[in-house]
C-alpha cells in the first residue's frame, strides 16, 4: 500500500515546486526588459562616490601633464632641424663664450711632481639663434643626456695632465636653454695641472700656479673667450688641502698664442700661494743651527782629550751631511742651489772648521814639540856688555841676511804644570867662528818654506824680546781655543742676520 502512495506524493510535490519558481523567473525577465526600454535605474550611493573621484583624478592628471607635452614639443621643435656639428654664426661672426669658474677645492700641491689638483665647476655661456623659441617657458633645464645633441665649445685645459669628469650618480653636467637663444653649459671636473715652481728662495718662496684653457680647433677669428667681470667664486669654507702653503689670491691674463694652424685666444687664471715657514723651520733650520752650535762644545774640551773632540767634530760633520741629503729627499732635481741649501752648506762649513781647528791646534803643539825634542834651553845670563855686543851682532846679521831669524822650539813647564813649547833667541855666531854667515844661511835655507808665514805671524807663546817679532801679529797657540769660542759664535750670528735680511727682503 505504501509503495503505491509514495510515488503519488512525490509527484504532487514536484508539481507544486514548479508552480512556485515560475513567477519569480518571469518577474526577473520583466525587470530586465524594463531596464532596456526605459534607461538605467538609479545606482547605489557607493557607486556614485567612486565615479566622482575618478573624474577628479583625471582632471588633476590632465592639468599636471599639460606643461610636459608643451616642453617636449618645444625641445623637439628646436632640435628637429638643429645641426650640432656647426657652431652658431658660422661664416658670419665669431662665437663669444663667457666663462665663469667656481672652485670647490684646491690642492694638494706636489713639489716633487710640480703639479697641483683643483676641483672646479666650469660654466660657459653663449648665444645660439637656432635655439630661440616663443613660449611661456623662460628656460629649459636639461641634464647631460642632451649635451650630445647640442653644439658645445671644444674648450680644453692646456696645462692639464689628467682630467676627471664626475659621473656619480649621473654625469655632473647641466644645460640651460633660454628663450632668446642663450645657452648655459655647466660641468664639474677635477684637474691635475702642471705648476712650474721656482725654488731659488725656498723655503721663503711664493708661487703662481696657472690654469690655462682655450679652444682646441677654433682660432681667434671664430671663437672669443671673455670673463664676465672676472667672476671667480672661491669656497674657502671647505678644507683646502694646501698643507705647506697659504692661499693669497688670484689673478688672470688673456693672451693670443700663435700656432701653425692659427692664432688662438688663451685665458689663464693664476692661483697665488705662499709657503708656510713653520714646517721647514722645524725640519731643517733648527736642527742645522743646533748641530752647528753643538760642534763648538769641542772648544771647551781639553786638548789632551783628542778622542772626545774628534768624535764630536766628525759627528757634527756627518749630521750636517745627513740633514743636507734629507732636505733634498722630497725636492725636485733642480740645477741651482736654494736658500736652504746655502744655509745648510754654511753650517757644514762651520762644523768642518771646528774640526779643522782642533787638527791645527794638535799639529802645532804635539808635532812641532816632537820634532824639536831637545833639552830645555834658557836665556844665558850675561853681563850688559856681552848683551850689547850680542845685540849688535844680531842686528848686523839681520841686515846682512835680509831679516833672517833663528827661532828654536824648546819645551818649558808652564804655571799649570803642562809642558809648553818655548822660543829662545840664540846668539848668532861671530863672523870669525867656524859657523860663519854661510853656515847661518844654510840653516835659514832649511826654513825657507815657513819664512813667509812667520814673517807676519808668530805662533809660539814666549817670544818677548825677539828682534824678528817686531811688526808681526802674535797668536798664542794655547789661546786658539779661546779665540774660537768668540770668533765662531760671533761670525755665525752675523751670518744669520745677513742671511735673513737678504732672504726676507729679496
Swiss-Prot record:
One Pfam family named in its UniProt record: Neur_chan_LBD
Reaction catalysis annotation: chloride(in) = chloride(out)
Localization in the cell: Cell membrane; Postsynaptic cell membrane
Keyword Ion transport among record annotations: yes
Xref: InterPro entries: GABAA/Glycine_rcpt, GABAAe_rcpt, Neur_chan_lig-bd, Neur_chan_lig-bd_sf, Neur_channel, Neuro-gated_channel_TM_sf, Neuro_actylchol_rec, Neurotrans-gated_channel_TM
Glycan-linked positions: 134, 252
GO BP annotations listed: chloride transmembrane transport; gamma-aminobutyric acid signaling pathway; inhibitory synapse assembly; negative regulation of chloride transport; synaptic transmission, GABAergic
Keyword Zinc tagged: no
Gene Ontology cellular-component terms listed: chloride channel complex; dendrite membrane; GABA-A receptor complex; postsynapse; postsynaptic membrane
Region described as Disordered: 23-66, 413-438
Signal peptide: 1-22
Tissue: Expressed in many tissues. Highest levels of expression in adult heart and placenta.
Database matches in PROSITE patterns: NEUROTR_ION_CHANNEL
Residues exposed to the Cytoplasmic side: 302-307, 365-485
Molecular-function GO terms, alphabetical: GABA-A receptor activity; GABA-gated chloride ion channel activity
Membrane topology: Multi-pass membrane protein
Subunit structure: Heteropentamer, formed by a combination of alpha (GABRA1-6), beta (GABRB1-3), gamma (GABRG1-3), delta (GABRD), epsilon (GABRE), rho (GABRR1-3), pi (GABRP) and theta (GABRQ) chains, each subunit exhibiting distinct physiological and pharmacological properties.
Written domain comment of the UniProt record: GABAARs subunits share a common topological structure: a peptide sequence made up of a long extracellular N-terminal, four transmembrane domains, intracellular or cytoplasmic domain located between the third and the fourth transmembrane domains.
Function: Epsilon subunit of the heteropentameric ligand-gated chloride channel gated by gamma-aminobutyric acid (GABA), a major inhibitory neurotransmitter in the brain. GABA-gated chloride channels, also named GABA(A) receptors (GABAAR), consist of five subunits arranged around a central pore and contain GABA active binding site(s) located at the alpha and beta subunit interfaces. When activated by GABA, GABAARs selectively allow the flow of chloride anions across the cell membrane down their electrochemical gradient.
NCBIfam families, per the entry: LIC
Entry similarity comment: Belongs to the ligand-gated ion channel (TC 1.A.9) family. Gamma-aminobutyric acid receptor (TC 1.A.9.5) subfamily. GABRE sub-subfamily.
Name of this protein: Gamma-aminobutyric acid receptor subunit epsilon
Organism: Homo sapiens (Human)
Gene: GABRE
Amino acid at each position: 500500500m505504501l509503495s503505491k502512495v509514495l510515488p503519488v506524493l512525490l509527484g504532487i510535490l514536484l508539481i507544486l515546486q514548479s508552480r512556485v519558481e515560475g513567477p519569480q523567473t518571469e518577474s526577473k525577465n520583466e525587470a530586465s526588459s524594463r531596464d532596456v526600454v526605459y534607461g538605467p535605474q538609479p545606482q547605489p550611493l557607493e557607486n556614485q562616490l567612486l565615479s566622482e573621484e575618478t573624474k577628479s583624478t583625471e582632471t588633476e592628471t590632465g592639468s599636471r601633464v599639460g606643461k610636459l607635452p608643451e616642453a617636449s614639443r618645444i625641445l623637439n621643435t628646436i632640435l628637429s632641424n638643429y645641426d650640432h656639428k656647426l657652431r652658431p654664426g658660422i661664416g658670419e661672426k665669431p662665437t663669444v663664450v663667457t666663462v665663469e669658474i667656481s672652485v670647490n677645492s684646491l690642492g694638494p700641491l706636489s713639489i716633487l711632481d710640480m703639479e697641483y689638483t683643483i676641483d672646479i665647476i666650469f660654466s660657459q655661456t653663449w648665444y645660439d639663434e637656432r635655439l630661440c623659441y616663443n613660449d611661456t617657458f623662460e628656460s629649459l633645464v636639461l641634464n647631460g643626456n642632451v649635451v650630445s645633441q647640442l653644439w658645445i665649445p671644444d674648450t680644453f685645459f692646456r696645462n692639464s695632465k689628467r682630467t676627471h669628469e664626475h659621473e656619480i650618480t649621473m654625469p655632473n653636467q647641466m644645460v640651460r636653454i633660454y628663450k632668446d637663444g642663450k645657452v648655459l653649459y655647466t660641468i664639474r671636473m677635477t684637474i691635475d695641472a702642471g705648476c712650474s715652481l721656482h725654488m731659488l728662495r725656498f723655503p721663503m718662496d711664493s708661487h703662481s700656479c696657472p690654469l690655462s684653457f682655450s679652444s682646441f680647433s677654433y682660432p681667434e677669428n671664430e671663437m672669443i673667450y671673455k670673463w664676465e667681470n672676472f667672476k671667480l667664486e672661491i669656497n674657502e669654507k671647505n678644507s683646502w688641502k694646501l698643507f705647506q702653503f697659504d692661499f693669497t689670491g688670484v689673478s688672470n691674463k688673456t693672451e693670443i698664442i700663435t700656432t701653425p694652424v692659427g692664432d688662438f685666444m688663451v685665458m689663464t687664471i693664476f692661483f697665488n700661494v705662499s709657503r708656510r715657514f713653520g714646517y721647514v723651520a722645524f725640519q731643517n733650520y733648527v736642527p742645522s743651527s743646533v748641530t752647528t752650535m753643538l760642534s763648538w762644545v769641542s772648544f771647551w774640551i781639553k786638548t789632551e782629550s783628542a778622542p772626545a773632540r774628534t768624535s764630536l767634530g766628525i759627528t757634527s760633520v756627518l749630521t750636517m751631511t745627513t740633514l743636507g741629503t734629507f732636505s733634498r729627499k722630497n725636492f725636485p732635481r733642480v740645477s741651482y742651489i736654494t736658500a736652504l741649501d746655502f744655509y745648510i752648506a754654511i753650517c757644514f762649513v762651520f762644523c768642518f772648521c771646528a774640526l779643522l781647528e782642533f787638527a791645527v791646534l794638535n799639529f802645532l803643539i804635539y808635532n812641532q814639540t816632537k820634532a824639536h825634542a831637545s833639552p830645555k834651553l834658557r836665556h844665558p845670563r850675561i853681563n850688559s856688555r856681552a848683551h850689547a855686543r850680542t845685540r849688535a851682532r844680531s842686528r848686523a846679521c839681520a841686515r846682512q841676511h835680509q831679516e833672517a831669524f833663528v827661532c828654536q822650539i824648546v819645551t818649558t813647564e808652564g804655571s799649570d804644570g803642562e809642558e809648553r813649547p818655548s822660543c829662545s833667541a840664540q846668539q848668532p855666531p861671530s863672523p870669525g867662528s867656524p859657523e860663519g854667515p854661510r853656515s847661518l844661511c844654510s840653516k835659514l835655507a832649511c826654513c825657507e818654506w815657513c819664512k813667509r808665514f812667520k814673517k807676519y805671524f808668530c805662533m809660539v807663546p814666549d817670544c818677548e824680546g825677539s828682534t824678528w817679532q817686531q811688526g808681526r801679529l802674535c797668536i798664542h797657540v794655547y789661546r786658539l781655543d779661546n779665540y774660537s769660542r768668540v770668533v765662531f759664535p760671533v761670525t755665525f750670528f752675523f751670518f744669520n742676520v745677513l742671511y735673513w735680511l737678504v732672504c726676507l727682503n729679496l
